[in-house]
């Protein structure tokens, strides 16, 4: 199992755009479950900060979100939407209450 947290800030006028694009990723995930992935995105109260949390459980450790075309679209112009670029860090789940399991 591999866990990753990605954080970034959008430009002040791009938070809503970013949210719409992220919502499309979740729509496609619901339609075409790639398996081996638990994924969440949070928008912080300031309206421009976002955090993505991914837990990958695949045999080879590859992240199946790369199979999602809406995610490719999300990544395509992320630099244009961001004031602070995305920073990804590996993470360790030390506890979870119904967050990563049904």
What is each stretch, according to the model?
Residues 2-9, 37-69:
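Short, well-ordered beta-strand segments in beta-rich or mixed alpha/beta enzyme
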Residues 9-20:
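Short, surface-exposed ligand-recognition loops at beta-strand->loop->(often short) alpha-helix junctions
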Residues 14-16, 60-62, 96:
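Residue-level signal for secondary-structure boundary sites
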Residues 24, 28-37, 55-89:
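An amphipathic, aromatic/His-enriched active-site/gating alpha helix that lines ligand/cofactor pockets
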Residues 41, 90-93:
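Hydrophobic/anchoring residues in structured secondary elements
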Residues 92-102:
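Short, low-order "capping/linker" segments at domain edges
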């Amino acid at each position: 199992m591999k866990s990753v947290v990605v954080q970034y800030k959008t430009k002040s006028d791009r938070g809503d755009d970013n949210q719409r694009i992220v919502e499309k990723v979740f729509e496609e995930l619901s339609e075409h479950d790639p398996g081996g992935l638990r994924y969440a995105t949070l928008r912080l109260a300031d309206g421009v900060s976002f955090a993505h949390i991914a837990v990958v459980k695949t045999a080879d450790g590859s992240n199946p979100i790369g199979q999602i075309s809406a995610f490719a679209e999300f990544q395509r112009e992320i630099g244009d939407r961001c004031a602070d670029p995305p920073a990804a860090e590996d993470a360790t789940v030390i506890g979870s209450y119904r967050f990563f399991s049904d």
